[in-house]
């Protein structure tokens, strides 16, 4: 008779969870940050709020964002005036948009990832879907399964309303699934659409205005599995270690609340300070076992919540400016796409590493770190090992 321990041993993969493909997608509507304040105050009938518009213009100018992509076009907003008002009851209109658009955008990214992977989609065993918006039943995971034509017995995991740290969460979950289920191939999808947070400006809620200056729409997808099939599957990054922690004394630092008016966004001023104060401890825990204490010797993928967070982390750790190059590039081109951001940065880094003739997918370096920051204040840490190009 076979023992339980023998069964468990047979169920486990031998090697680490490996990212085997990456795909990204954005809505067609590209928004230029320089002209966005004019559009935003016009479409929300707020042009009379001159001082507030000037404040918003300064926020946009300081954001280090050149462009963003948004599902909400001028036409859609004109058809849904309640979405443009500050705190007007509008959840029905928002839900009608996102329950369709979130899985659809996710499908676009997933199709690209599956194409790069090069294997039949029938080999996908697990699906992790993550989004901040559009809670529905059956969920976006079910809708994506139908849209892609995945097998009905794919094992699904749906993560709603986790926020900006969740790009790290999906990697942590995918790692555990891949390493504990021999032969598993996990499709990971983060799809974020800001239709649930868009609203007009208010003098009394400036944190909402910060969100209007930063957030953009995007979806990213990965294929994750252990023990890549030689000659067929091409590893991009290996996931070696993961952690999640709640930063001490950070309650209320970043909050979101689902209301009749959509998802509201609340932010304390010292979020960059809280992140930078706690990042050293997270790095020591992650890299001490590897005997790494020089954080300029590793590659960096940090959720770009905003330029102030990146600036303070760089300052605290005395990081060279090029360490955050891929992160800042994604912030500049796409804005803050919540959970999808770090996956976009992974894609940016491996592509630029190849284009620049570097030796590894991690900017020529062997080890790297990926950070997610979000509500809680929650910090996700993933230790990555690059692959030779």
Curated annotation (Swiss-Prot):
Enzyme class: transferase
Pathway annotation from the record: Secondary metabolite biosynthesis; flavonoid biosynthesis
Any GO MF annotation of the entry: naringenin-chalcone synthase activity
Biological processes, Gene Ontology terms: flavonoid biosynthetic process; polyketide biosynthetic process
InterPro entries per UniProt: Chalcone/stilbene_synt_C, Chalcone/stilbene_synt_N, Chalcone/stilbene_synthase_AS, Polyketide_synthase_type-III, Thiolase-like
Enzyme nomenclature, EC number: 2.3.1.74
Pfam families for this protein: Chal_sti_synt_C, Chal_sti_synt_N
Active site: 164
Protein role: The primary product of this enzyme is 4,2',4',6'-tetrahydroxychalcone (also termed naringenin-chalcone or chalcone) which can under specific conditions spontaneously isomerize into naringenin.
Name assigned to this protein: Chalcone synthase 2
